[in-house]
Amino acid sequence: MTATIDRRLSTLNPNAPVFDPVEFREVEDFSPKWWDLVTTSKWFRDFWLSANSENEFLGGDDFSVMEEEFEEMIASSDGGSMADTVTEADVASYLKMLLNIAESTKEKIYRSKVSSCSPKYNQKKYMNPNFNCRRNHHIYQPR
């Protein structure tokens, strides 16, 4: 079964680049090409966010490992002088804050493309009931 497209009625962009999902998957993260794809392609942005979701940090084991590594890093820097002033509760609250920031920015990226126009344009336009539409100017009824 073949489909023919009438070029006069088509709204497709003839100058658009070829869609190749394999090429999109091979883009290096955070490169200029990656950034261009994330900002211009909703499909790629959703694909990348689903493939690189941060849900693995929500588990207790991974969070405790990160907390221990953070404490070791603080203890190793400055000969342990700062390790006395930082408590485990401070580290845990700081890491939770960072995870919340990451989640909120992910939602903002998605929401920025969903509602791009102002709310005043989303309101329904009401027509004048006395307005005569050109194509329905005459009402034809059977006799």
UniProtKB/Swiss-Prot annotation:
Motif (PAM2-like): 11-21
Protein's recorded name: Polyadenylate-binding protein-interacting protein 2
Organism expressing this protein natively: Arabidopsis thaliana (Mouse-ear cress)
UniProt cross-references to PANTHER family, sorted A to Z: OS05G0344200 PROTEIN, POLYADENYLATE-BINDING PROTEIN-INTERACTING PROTEIN 2
Comment field on protein domains: Contains a PAM2-like motif, which seems to be involved in the binding to the PABC/CTC domain of PAB proteins.
